Amino acid sequence: MQEKGLAGKMMDIVPGLLVMVGTLYVLRTYVEPWMKDAVVFGRKGWLVQVLSLNYILLSILTGMFYRNILFGGKIPGWAEEGFRTTRLFIKTGVIMLGSLYTFDKLLKVGGVAITLIVAFVFGTAIFIMWLGSRLGADRSVTATMAAACGVCGVSAAVATAPGVRAKPVDLALSIATILGFGIMTMFVSPFIGKALQLSDYQFGAWVGTGILNSGQVLATCLAFNPVFAPGTAVAYGEIWNVVRVICIPFVVFFITAWYWKGEADAEHTSLGSILASKFPIFVLGFVGMTALSSLHMLGAEGSETLHLMRDVMAWIFGVGLVGLGAYIDVREIKAAGGVPLRIGLIAGMVKYILALIIILAFIPKEGAF
């Protein structure tokens, strides 16, 4: 079969991409405004204000509906290439989020973020190593679960798997477990945050620390407050998220070193090689956008340029989150069972609750910007 050229590959993307963009258009233009005006339990806008059913969560739910009901559990071939752009949309949105910050603002909250994230990332990994040994779990399973729960879910688990000889089934179980837990927290966290009257700063710090998957952190922050601007939940949550993502190569090295200690014939890799191969390149784009903002090259706060960028960000994230929902396979989550499920749920719940306690005890309501 003759390999397709660039034009052919681009055309393959169009059908699935049109589905995602069209879905978001309908949700933002018709469904969300209707829900804001709908009267439930005698209260106008109850669905949005109490359940946080804005276009962000609706995008994910619609994507899940496509995958698990409309498509019968598998994205069809005609739409597959379009839906594969999901990660590109989300990472592009993360890069654009850099426009919400300046370096002086990052320095004001960076110390708190680094302290909390490093403590939780490595603390979670160590806890899972201990829990896995107590429950008699395979070391490869324990290692991938430690990465998945400790850092940011799928990316960290995939990055760790080769160095700890994880089998495909080990990786699949780890990913399914943390995604399943993340889906639950993604929907309940906005409700908890509003019930506890958390500020955007507190909510962003909690979610950025306690939720396991990067995409779910963004979705949860936007469900709590869908506004893209400095001082909002997504602005604070993404600082925590970026710090956590930067930790990936260091955690991969830490976990693989633990694995080697118990496996005499395991393959040794240096920290330098792991840094070179695992460092998340999109973080550099985020930093670059922050540099442009710091130099006032994107315009002053409230400018037309920034207003346009934030509107574009909303669309980029919305399209990406429709795709994110379409990659949540309920059958795979149900298949995650036994010891891996117990490890993931215990560790995830401990991290989630402990993060909330620490945020309530030590993080003030007012952020640095």
UniProtKB/Swiss-Prot annotation:
Membrane topology field: Multi-pass membrane protein
Alphabetized InterPro entries for the sequence: UPF0324_pro
GO cellular component, one term: plasma membrane
Main location: membrane
Protein keywords: Cell membrane, Membrane, Transmembrane, Transmembrane helix
Subcellular localization, as worded in the UniProt entry: Cell membrane
Superkingdom per UniProt: Bacteria
Positions of transmembrane segments: 13-31, 46-65, 110-132, 142-164, 171-193, 240-262, 269-291, 306-328, 341-363
Similarity-based family: Belongs to the UPF0324 family.
Protein name: UPF0324 membrane protein DVU_0543
